[in-house]
């Protein structure tokens, strides 16, 4: 595996999710380096705001705040489903150079305008009634991501992948605080049962072998462990899921190897996106004492 330093989290996520949709046919498991990063498409030249809606599942507490930005907090809560509306305002000055740089440059600003909750029944009825065109995708964010930031990133990925109404954000109760790493670790493990439940609902709504998962950083632990739990109920040769993408995976590499044979029958393809220049993963290795899966 060749090493490619200098990629940001945002660049890694866009690269991995683009690979996910572009390579949805059956094949062997893959490992990709930063050399495979595609250019980020920039289509808008107008400075007029663009509004996008992202469906979400969250386990966060409701704060009672009056603004969309503090609608959900960083504590554990009940399952809530709905849509977060994001407004993206392009910055014309940056757009001509954004797709020419070897690293990620935002070509606009994103604002969480509103949060609309819907019932669980209504939420899952809508995707089931839509024609199957693209692979549905569940995105699990990583450590230090609040609800607003998670919605903004999800809107960016949904736009780049052209997955309107097919992209689903799972927002577990990360604290959005750099110093609360161990708190986030507890919360991602607490969330595993709910991640498993959400994957099962997606399979029910879209069909077996159609669902893709992209998980980032600490979110990879939730994705992997949810699949381990699902393996107990899996029978037959057909995979339950289409593609699992693990980006900058903050999970013990040795533990992942132990689980790989367990989760492999459930997923048609597994892709790792790795880096040798990820400061967060280097710090995680120091804290835990063992290499992380997302490091080369």
Q: Which residues make up each language-model segment?
A:
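Gly/Ala-rich beta-loop-alpha elbow adjacent to hydrolase catalytic centers
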Residues: 215, 219, 223
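Short beta-strand element of the alpha/beta-hydrolase
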Residues: 134-141
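Short substrate-entry loop that stabilizes the transition state in hydrolases
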Residues: 145-150
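C-terminal motif of bacterial Sec signal peptides marking the signal peptidase cleavage site
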Residues: 21-23
């Amino acid at each position: 595996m060749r090493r490619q330093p200098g990629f940001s989290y945002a660049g890694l996520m866009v690269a991995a999710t683009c690979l996910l949709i572009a390579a949805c046919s059956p094949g062997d498991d893959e490992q990709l380096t930063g050399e495979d990063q595609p250019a980020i498409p920039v289509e808008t030249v107008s400075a007029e705001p663009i509004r996008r809606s992202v469906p979400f599942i969250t386990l966060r507490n409701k704060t009672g705040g009056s603004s969309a930005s503090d609608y959900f907090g960083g504590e554990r809560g009940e399952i809530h489903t709905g849509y977060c509306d994001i407004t993206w305002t392009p910055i014309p000055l940056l757009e001509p150079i954004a797709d020419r740089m070897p690293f990620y440059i935002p070509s606009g600003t994103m604002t969480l305008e509103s949060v609309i909750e819907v019932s669980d029944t209504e939420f899952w009825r809508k995707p089931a009634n839509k024609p199957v065109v693209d692979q549905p995708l569940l995105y699990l964010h990583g450590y230090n991501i609040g609800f607003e930031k998670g919605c903004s990133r999800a809107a960016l990925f949904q736009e780049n992948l052209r997955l309107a109404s097919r992209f689903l954000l799972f927002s577990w109760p990360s604290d959005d605080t750099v110093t609360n790493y161990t708190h986030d670790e507890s919360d991602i493990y607490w969330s595993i049962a709910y991640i498993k439940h959400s994957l099962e609902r997606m399979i029910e709504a879209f069909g077996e072998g159609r669902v893709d998962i992209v998980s980032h950083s600490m979110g990879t632990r939730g994705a992997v462990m949810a699949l381990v739990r699902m393996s107990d109920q899996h029978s037959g040769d057909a995979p339950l899921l289409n593609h699992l993408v693990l980006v900058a995976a903050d999970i013990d590499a040795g533990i992942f190897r132990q689980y790989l044979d367990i989760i492999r029958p459930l997923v048609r393809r597994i892709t790792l996106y790795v880096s040798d220049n990820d400061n967060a993963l280097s710090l995680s290795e120091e804290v835990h004492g063992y290499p992380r899966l997302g490091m080369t």
